[in-house]
């Protein structure tokens, strides 16, 4: 991880930038309308759109894609259409503005907090398109919409600066899967095609990050109960279950939620090549009574604590 740490340190602002400075880069953003402290926002290195979001990307049949069986993909299924979004691509783009089942969605992945969320882009009668600000808050991706140039916290789906301050995007059900499991479940599914952008796809620029002692560019409190900050947790609303706990039992049924775990999926934030990352397994989350899939995410513990400070830690007995 030394190479990426050095590179990011060279670009990251040592102190939190203030709104007057940002106004030069963002002249159309209303910085007087905010719900967060500007001191919480740092530069992550690349500037506005330095990490380019994907717009209306191409897809290919799952049967035609040459991906490693155990590499991770984000899965979205809407109105009978299933699409997979390989982390090998989202690692370098973080946002894909697209449609699934006729629904305009933003498929998002924040490497530094391991948050993968899918949002409905429709809000107040318009369809929003999202880009990457290049800013981080509590090490979490800050997005912006191109229609109003408001800033959004990816972890919460909430507008935090500008005309959309306080607005909230609808989060849609998605999950992280191994490529082989996606193909088995959706043999007629589609997968995001390799973008026509010069990036080292398949590699992880944050080598060793998920075994680091501390998160990068994080200024908030550490998790309680001596939980390692980069431990993965399954977040369902304001509740968090430790992945380590789930791996020991492979299934947890608790508080109205059923969570399952199965081995066979690589960590995208371990080794330099994603397909060689250690096996962290894949999880699914359901309503314990109806069996319906639930909105959830698998995130780092520090990020859950930062963005859900009143959250419940489901530690078991």
Give a label for each model feature:
Residues 1-4:
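Positively charged n-region of N-terminal signal peptides that target proteins for export
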Residues 12-14:
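N-terminal signal peptide c-region/cleavage motif recognized by signal peptidases
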